[in-house]
Regions:
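Residues forming the flavin
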Residues: 1-171
Length: 171
């Protein structure tokens, strides 16, 4: 939620993978639980693609929707209990589905901190078009800023997983 749109055209890289991984953890605790993952464009980077396959094998239901037809959520009472009714057009089935959910979890975009511009000004470092900190040179100096003595690592640079952050920290 909140990326790969006009406001933020980048992929947060961690949202889809964590949604799938959390679905697997829920299935581990209760194999009979119904889990739906609604997505516009599933992107499970690296070995996280294995999580996607495993989740599919464990009957996690993946529903793709088009950006023009986003899911709608309403609080309703069904069978005497409050639920969240999620209405989503299924692009593959060509029909609109209604899912009554007890819980709803959003995989939110990784966005730069509101103080990023202020920090960039203090350290005299540059930002990329998405307002993440920009390295001096993507190939030759990937953890350096143009300003000397200041180094770059982790999601301040761009959305990334922890192993990528650790690798970047080693320089």
């Amino acid at each position: 939620v909140g990326c790969r749109n006009q406001e933020r055209n980048y992929c947060s890289r961690v949202c889809c993978g964590h949604a799938v991984k959390n679905a697997l953890k829920l299935k581990e605790k209760n194999p009979d639980v119904d889990i739906y993952i609604l997505f516009r464009d599933m992107r499970t980077y690296g070995f996280r693609e294995d999580f996607y396959r495993e989740a599919s094998d464990k009957h996690v239901k993946f529903i793709r929707y088009e950006p023009e037809e986003k899911p709608v959520v309403k609080a309703v009472v069904a069978e005497g209990k409050p639920v969240l009714r999620v209405t989503v057009p299924d692009a593959i089935l060509g029909q609109t589905l209604e899912i009554d959910a007890d819980y709803l979890s959003l995989a939110a975009a990784v966005v730069p901190s509101e103080s990023t511009r202020e920090i960039a000004g203090h350290f005299k470092v540059t930002l990329n078009p998405d307002d993440f900190f920009k390295e001096a040179h993507v190939k030759l100096r990937p953890v350096d800023f143009a300003a000397g003595g200041v180094f770059l690592c982790g999601t301040a640079h761009y959305p990334k997983h922890i192993p990528e952050t650790i690798s970047q920290a080693y320089g």
